[in-house]
């Protein structure tokens, strides 16, 4: 898409690049707060795989979580690579960045946006403005959208379409800074699995990727992965796309949920990659009596909509014990827990795992923790 942009330097000034010239090599990427370094690692790995040099990457450039700023490389190629990332939500090409005055911020935003040159707006039949606001202000994101949208309509005369626009302009406010961007992703990249069964609560695919990232999965042909709280199947589907040779197993205490996960797997074309069954994670020895796994990656109940009746101290203790028995020597357990203090206490008390990494992430307005644990093997095990 032809695009005239204002290249944003790190000192906040702008430099215009014409639609015929080379686009500036800057990207603004969003993810779950707490996963910024996961995005960085994935991007650098994809650049290495493509034979491209590393680029400058800044985490949380505006002081708020879930942000990654990228500079370097050829702009369109970098955008293509960014659009393939599995750990992110949206990709933006910055157009203009400016500081907001203490008074009259909305008017200032409207004035700045009205004179902004965006070649894509010249030919677009429809557009929309979206906004995210972080910090303390006397206005909301909807106010920003209305004022910026009115400015672009006056400038270009392009019709507004809030559902399916040709062009989406993002106007974000971070404290006293405003960033105007061209949004390359019309829907979140974390919403990549089309399901027949969509539960009310499902793990975001981006967070599933992060769990797999912390598992440090290798490339052995006989490696196996289990999700004993598989739900609708997000972790297994993510693993199926990333690791073509990994044998996948899933279980859930609810037979209906298992049936729905099978339907989802069929819809995604990966039913042949995984074995799903009904079973209680507190009794994995009975569910998988003859099988041990290299990795267990899972998302146990948080105790909000599901698992409200559980004694989580006993629950986590039993799950840790069963995971230890079902993991091979050298195995790894990665899970996300909302009641993280209880989980930490259970992990220390059982003494079956060594904590390798712990991370707070934001997902769905909650702040659970990812735990990556290595199995503590007994002498003489094989």
At which residue positions do the language-model features occur?
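Long recognition/docking surfaces used for binding and targeting
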Residues: 105-115, 122-161, 169
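Class I S-adenosyl-L-methionine-dependent methyltransferase catalytic core
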Residues: 2-46, 50, 54, 58-67, ...
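Conserved AdoMet
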Residues: 62-120
């Amino acid at each position: 898409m032809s695009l005239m942009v204002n290249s944003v330097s790190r000192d906040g000034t702008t430099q215009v690049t014409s639609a015929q010239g080379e686009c500036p090599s800057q990207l603004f990427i969003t993810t779950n707060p707490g996963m910024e370094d996961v995005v960085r690692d994935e991007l650098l790995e994809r650049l290495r795989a493509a034979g491209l040099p590393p680029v400058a990457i800044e985490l949380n450039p505006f002081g708020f979580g879930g942000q990654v700023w990228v500079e370097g490389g050829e702009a369109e190629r970098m955008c293509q690579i960014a659009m393939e990332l599995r750990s992110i939500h949206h990709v933006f090409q910055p157009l203009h960045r400016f500081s907001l005055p203490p008074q009259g911020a909305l008017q200032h935003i409207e004035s700045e946006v009205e004179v902004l040159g965006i070649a894509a707006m010249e030919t677009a039949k429809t557009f929309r403005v979206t906004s995210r606001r972080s910090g303390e202000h006397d206005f909301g994101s909807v106010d920003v959208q209305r004022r910026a949208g009115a400015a672009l309509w006056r400038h270009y005369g392009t019709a507004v379409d809030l559902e399916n626009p040709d062009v989406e302009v993002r106007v974000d406010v971070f404290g006293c800074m405003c960033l105007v961007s061209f949004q390359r992703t019309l829907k979140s990249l974390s919403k990549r699995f089309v399901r027949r069964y969509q539960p009310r609560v499902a793990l975001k695919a981006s967070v599933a990727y992060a769990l797999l990232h912390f598992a440090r999965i290798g490339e052995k042909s006989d490696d196996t992965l289990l999700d004993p709280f598989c739900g609708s199947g997000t972790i297994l589907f993510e693993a199926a796309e990333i690791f073509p040779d990994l044998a996948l197993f899933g279980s859930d205490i609810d037979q209906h949920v298992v049936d729905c996960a099978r339907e989802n797997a069929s819809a995604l074309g990966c039913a042949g990659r995984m074995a799903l069954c009904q079973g209680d994670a507190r009794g994995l020895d009975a569910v998988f009596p003859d099988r041990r796994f290299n990795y267990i990656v899972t998302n146990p109940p948080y105790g909000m909509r599901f698992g409200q009746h559980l004694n989580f101290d006993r629950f986590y203790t039993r799950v840790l014990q069963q995971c230890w028995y079902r993991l091979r020597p050298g195995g790894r357990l990665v899970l996300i827990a909302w009641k993280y203090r209880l989980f930490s206490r259970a992990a220390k008390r059982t003494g079956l795992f060594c904590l390798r990494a712990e991370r707070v992430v934001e997902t769905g307005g909650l702040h659970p923790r990812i735990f990556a644990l290595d199995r503590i093997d007994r002498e003489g095990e094989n």
